[in-house]
Amino acid sequence: MPTITHKDTKLAYGVKGSGKPAFVFIHGWTCNRSFFAPQAKHFARRHRVVSLDLRGHGESDKPKGPYPIGAYVDDIAFLIGTLRLGKVVAVGHSMGGITALQLGADHPDKVAGIVMVDPAPLVFPPELKTGVDAIVAAIEAGNQEPRRHFIANNLFMKTSDKRLVKQVLKVMMAAPTHIAAAAMKGILAFDGPAVAAR
């Protein structure tokens, strides 16, 4: 597993394939780079593909925080430059979707295109924000059941493969509590309309 270090944080990533434009896959909240493995395998047939574990996730270092979306963006921009990827297609899921959006806004010289897969909300409706705030408070208080319930009951369809649900739930619940709380606060603080307008 290759790593780079940015701002005293070791970041784990994987690279495969060749060809331009390169694709950078950006996972979601409390997930890791393995979530994009099928897509990485497919696009690596014709493109250079990079999948990374965002800071605080997977095999990357897990500093105390905070975890604003901009911190992930800075790490990804550094990775793009270090690997000399040129202008990339940034593909992000959930939290990774809004991270890809801000990457394009902050670093248009590094981004050829953006794909947002079921992104986190650009604007949280008040009732949703209230509910997510309560989940964050529960996580910080040591109660992980609301977090588990949120993942199991809001991130899947009723027809989802039960084994897949169990596997994803295991990975997401394994994320340290300080990461789960701080990363969600970063999502809530994201100014979607302002970033999208750029």
Tell where the protein language model's regions lie, with residue ranges:
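Hydrophobic alpha-helical packing elements
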Residues: Q39, Y72-D75, A180
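Structural signature of beta-strand start/N-cap positions in the alpha/beta core
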Residues: T9, A22, R46-R48, R84-V89, ...
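Conserved HGGG/HGGXW glycine-rich cap/lid loop of the alpha/beta-hydrolase fold
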Residues: T9-G65
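Conserved alpha/beta-hydrolase catalytic His-Asp/Glu region
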Residues: V123-G131, A141-A197
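Conserved acidic catalytic loop of the alpha/beta-hydrolase fold
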Residues: G70-V88
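Conserved hydrolase catalytic core segment
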Residues: L85-P125
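Short, conserved loop/helix-junction motifs that constitute active-site signature segments
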Residues: F43-A44, A196-R198
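N-terminal cap/lid segment of alpha/beta-hydrolase-fold proteins
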Residues: M1-K10
